[in-house]
């Protein structure tokens, strides 16, 4: 049986709609009928066919890894799922036999493969993944929100890396993940949450999500904002979401002594860092990749159930046949999360 999918078909700019074979389920897998998918920044990289994509992405391949769907098939070894369960899923498929997997630190698996990055992804009518990777969506959480659990998980993993209660938090990069991280920080009790970017549309989105200050660093100085807020000692926690070298070095300069920094944004490989800031301030730096399995997923559900409102971050919806409009909108930078509806 053939199904509709969005695939990287050629080693050049673009993503195309095509027909592929319906994926076959193994003994430990679930077959999921996709309801909604969201476009990730990674999908935009794949669309643009940048240097990272050229080195990483096999062609042809079905792309996409942010989704919500319904279980329609269950492998014979699988327990704990029933037909009709609403699920999203962890996009990092791990080996299960390396030291970190066996030690319960699966997010640090050295043999990780990515759904929609190294193997066929979720931008299709059906997806097969190991049942281990599926996460049941609690009742009361909408399909829209469930479809963005993957990037929300990046935000939660990064934001909750350090204690935020009563702390001053600086977030560099107001993409959807940075904005969601800011909302999490506010929700769990940070004092001042300041986010920086040069994209005024996204800074406005951050303001709607309740940040203390959204700062356009093209025309406002961070130190002025700090003194306006009565901050005399620098930020306690930094969350770097942009991958922009000047943003990271500006963050290091703005941190308090003993501050803690989590890095999610991927910088150029030759980024220069002012290491004296790190050494003399005694900063702690932590790299973040993906989500903790599955601690982050349970935290995400609990945060939404406890009143965290992420709905403003979802700005655009398109039918799957209008996927090109969705990608154009994401590439313009004038959007939050863009959702594609498969039903």
From Swiss-Prot:
One term under GO cellular component: cytoplasm
Cofactor annotation remark: Binds 2 Zn(2+) ions per subunit.
Annotated InterPro entries: ADH-like_C (IPR013149), ADH-like_N (IPR013154), ADH_Zn_CS (IPR002328), GroES-like_sf (IPR011032), L-Threonine_3-DHase (IPR004627), NAD(P)-bd_dom_sf (IPR036291), PKS_ER (IPR020843), Zn_alcohol_dh (IPR050129)
A GO BP entry: L-threonine catabolic process to glycine
Site (Important for catalytic activity for the proton relay mechanism but does not participate directly in the coordination of zinc atom): 150
Keyword vocabulary terms for this entry: Cytoplasm, Metal-binding, NAD, Oxidoreductase, Zinc
Binding, NAD(+): 177, 197, 202, 264-266, 288-289
Subcellular location: Cytoplasm
Binding residues for Zn(2+) 2: 95, 98, 101, 109
Protein EC: 1.1.1.103
Active site (UniProt): 42 (charge relay system), 45 (charge relay system)
Cofactor dependency: Zn(2+)
Superkingdom of the organism of origin: Bacteria
Pathway connected to this protein: Amino-acid degradation; L-threonine degradation via oxydo-reductase pathway; glycine from L-threonine: step 1/2
Class in the EC hierarchy, top level: oxidoreductase
Subunit structure: Homotetramer.
Purpose: Catalyzes the NAD(+)-dependent oxidation of L-threonine to 2-amino-3-ketobutyrate.
HAMAP family referenced in this protein's UniProt entry, alphabetically: Thr_dehydrog
Family: Belongs to the zinc-containing alcohol dehydrogenase family.
The protein, known as: L-threonine 3-dehydrogenase
Organism: Photobacterium profundum (strain SS9)
Gene: tdh
């Amino acid at each position: 049986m053939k199904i509709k999918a969005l695939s990287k078909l050629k080693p050049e700019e673009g993503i195309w709609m095509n027909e592929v074979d319906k994926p076959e389920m193994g003994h430990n897998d679930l077959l999921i009928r996709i309801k909604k998918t969201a476009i990730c920044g990674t999908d935009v990289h794949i669309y643009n066919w940048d240097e990272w994509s050229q080195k990483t992405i096999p062609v042809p391949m079905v792309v996409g890894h942010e989704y919500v769907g319904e279980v329609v098939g269950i492998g014979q070894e699988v327990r704990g799922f029933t037909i009709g369960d609403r699920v999203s899923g962890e996009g990092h498929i791990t080996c299960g036999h390396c030291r970190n997997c066996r030690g319960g630190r699966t997010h640090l698996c050295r043999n990780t493969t990515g759904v929609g990055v190294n193997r066929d992804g979720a931008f299709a009518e059906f997806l097969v993944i190991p049942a281990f990777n599926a996460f049941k969506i609690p009742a009361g959480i909408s399909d829209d929100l469930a479809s963005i659990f993957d990037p929300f998980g990046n935000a939660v993993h990064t934001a909750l890396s350090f204690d935020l209660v009563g702390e001053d938090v600086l977030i560099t990069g107001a993409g959807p993940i940075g904005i969601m991280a800011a909302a999490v920080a506010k929700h769990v009790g940070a004092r001042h949450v300041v986010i920086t970017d040069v994209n005024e549309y996204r800074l406005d989105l951050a303001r709607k999500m309740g940040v203390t200050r959204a700062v356009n660093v093209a025309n406002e100085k961070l130190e002025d904002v700090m003194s306006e807020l009565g901050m005399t000692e620098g930020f306690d926690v930094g969350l770097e979401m942009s991958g922009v070298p000047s943003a990271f070095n500006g963050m290091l300069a703005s941190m308090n002594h003993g501050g803690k920094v989590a890095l999610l944004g991927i910088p150029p490989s030759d980024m220069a860092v002012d290491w004296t800031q790190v050494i003399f301030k005694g900063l702690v730096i932590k790299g973040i990749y993906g989500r903790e399995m599955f601690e982050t997923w349970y935290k995400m559900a609990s945060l939404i159930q406890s009143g965290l409102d992420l709905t403003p971050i979802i700005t655009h919806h398109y039918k799957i046949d209008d996927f090109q409009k969705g990608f154009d909108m994401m590439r313009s930078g004038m959007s939050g999360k863009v959702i594609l509806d498969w039903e």
